[in-house]
């Protein structure tokens, strides 16, 4: 959006503040319905950031896909689970939880040490894509594809891993 500097900064700060509050709500609220609505608020704030960064296509895709589909699916799934099941489960810690926690912590620490030490620009083909984008020979959708395959390759892969893990978790919960 072409906004004056102070208004742009105020919207960015407001969006960041609401994003932090929504993220804390997702983690700290005990009622799963409230937590799912907080997740929807977080996704809407992320879409606001995309709008402020003049990436309208990604912002609308964020709203339609994540808020309009995935978050609504999460809310429906939580609503179908009986509320008494949440309070009956008194077995809070099992061996599988401990093993999973160790694996996740190991992966996070290995990523934290690997990502800063890796020269991502040597791996990716950014020079060719930047030349094509600067010449203006392609449209916006092709620019998004080129940027996803070059500049934003790592975040794109991390998002795909997060979606895969959430899909596996949903299947596991559905089988129980």
Swiss-Prot record:
The keyword Cell membrane does not apply. It is a multi-pass membrane protein. The chain crosses the membrane at residues 10-30, 33-53, 60-80, 95-115, 152-172. It catalyses: a plastoquinone + NADH + (n+1) H(+)(in) = a plastoquinol + NAD(+) + n H(+)(out); a plastoquinone + NADPH + (n+1) H(+)(in) = a plastoquinol + NADP(+) + n H(+)(out). Its EC number is 7.1.1.-. It is found in: Plastid, Chloroplast thylakoid membrane. It holds the Pfam family Oxidored_q3. Its main location: plastid. GO terms for molecular function: NADH dehydrogenase (ubiquinone) activity; quinone binding. It comes from the Eukaryota. Keywords: Chloroplast, Membrane, NAD, NADP, Plastid, Plastoquinone, Quinone, Thylakoid, Translocase, Transmembrane, Transmembrane helix, Transport. GO terms for cellular component: chloroplast thylakoid membrane. The keyword Cell inner membrane does not apply. NDH shuttles electrons from NAD(P)H:plastoquinone, via FMN and iron-sulfur (Fe-S) centers, to quinones in the photosynthetic chain and possibly in a chloroplast respiratory chain. The immediate electron acceptor for the enzyme in this species is believed to be plastoquinone. Couples the redox reaction to proton translocation, and thus conserves the redox energy in a proton gradient. Belongs to the complex I subunit 6 family. PANTHER family: NAD(P)H-QUINONE OXIDOREDUCTASE SUBUNIT 6, CHLOROPLASTIC. NDH is composed of at least 16 different subunits, 5 of which are encoded in the nucleus. This is NAD(P)H-quinone oxidoreductase subunit 6, chloroplastic. It comes from Lolium perenne. The gene is ndhG.
């Amino acid at each position: 959006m072409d906004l004056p500097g102070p208004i742009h900064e105020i919207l960015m700060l407001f969006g960041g503040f609401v994003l932090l509050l929504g993220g804390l709500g997702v983690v700290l609220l005990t009622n799963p319905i409230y937590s799912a609505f907080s997740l929807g608020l977080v996704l809407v704030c992320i879409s606001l950031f995309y709008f402020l960064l003049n990436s309208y296509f990604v912002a609308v895709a964020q709203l339609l896909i994540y808020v309009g589909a995935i978050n609504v699916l999460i809310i429906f799934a939580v609503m179908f689970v009986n509320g008494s099941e949440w309070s009956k489960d008194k077995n809070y810690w099992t061996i599988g939880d401990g093993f999973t926690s160790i694996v996740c912590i190991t992966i996070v620490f290995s990523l934290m040490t690997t990502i800063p030490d890796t020269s991502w620009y040597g791996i990716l083909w950014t020079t060719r894509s930047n030349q094509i984008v600067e010449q203006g020979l392609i449209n916006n959708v092709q620019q998004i594809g080129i940027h996803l395959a070059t500049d934003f390759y790592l975040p794109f892969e991390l998002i795909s891993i997060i979606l895969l893990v959430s899909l596996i978790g949903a299947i596991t919960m559905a089988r129980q």
